[in-house]
A protein has these predicted regions:
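Cytosolic, long alpha-helical scaffolding segments
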Residues: 1-162
Length: 162
């Protein structure tokens, strides 16, 4: 029974890793389109956002299946609960990447816009998504804390952009 549960947890980790990669790709494309002033580069971001939505539904269903069929306790329950929180955040990140891609024509029409900070924020956010999922899958508390510390840098850049 436990081996089946472990296999399902491994599948959950794989799905989370794939969703994280999709989010990172969406952020990267939006930033690249902005940096290179090329609206066409941002076109796939909407599809990636839809993919992120689908991945959220898939992972949510997997988590609910684990909760209902396996009735996990303690550490396993916390892992599934954390996964549910992560997918909500990653889905929102996908939405925000799509929003950035959507407003790129506006940014490009204002020649005074400097994308340096936004592009740096995107690069940091993309890296943070990847590292967060990695920390979760490997159960690496130190990496998770490191990612949390990086959030302050993104916040500083965001304040400067506003």
């Amino acid at each position: 029974m436990r081996s089946k549960f472990d296999q399902q947890l491994a599948a959950l980790n794989q799905e989370l890793t794939e969703m994280g990669a999709t989010c990172a790709q969406a952020i990267g494309l939006a930033a690249q389109a902005l940096e290179q002033q090329d609206v066409a580069l941002a076109a796939p971001v909407g599809q990636l956002e839809e993919q992120t939505n689908e991945q959220e539904r898939t992972i949510e269903a997997l988590c609910l299946k684990l909760l209902l069929q396996q009735q996990p306790v303690a550490r396993d329950l916390r892992q599934i609960s954390a996964a549910l929180k992560m997918i909500t955040d990653m889905e929102r990140i996908g939405d925000q990447a799509a929003d950035i891609a959507e407003i790129i024509p506006f940014f490009l029409s204002h020649n005074t816009f400097d994308c340096t900070l936004v592009c740096r924020m995107a690069q940091q956010a993309s890296s943070m998504v990847t590292q967060s999922v990695d920390a979760f899958v490997r159960r690496d508390v130190y990496l998770a804390r490191s990612v949390a510390g990086q959030d302050d840098l993104v916040d500083e850049d965001f304040t400067a952009v506003k």
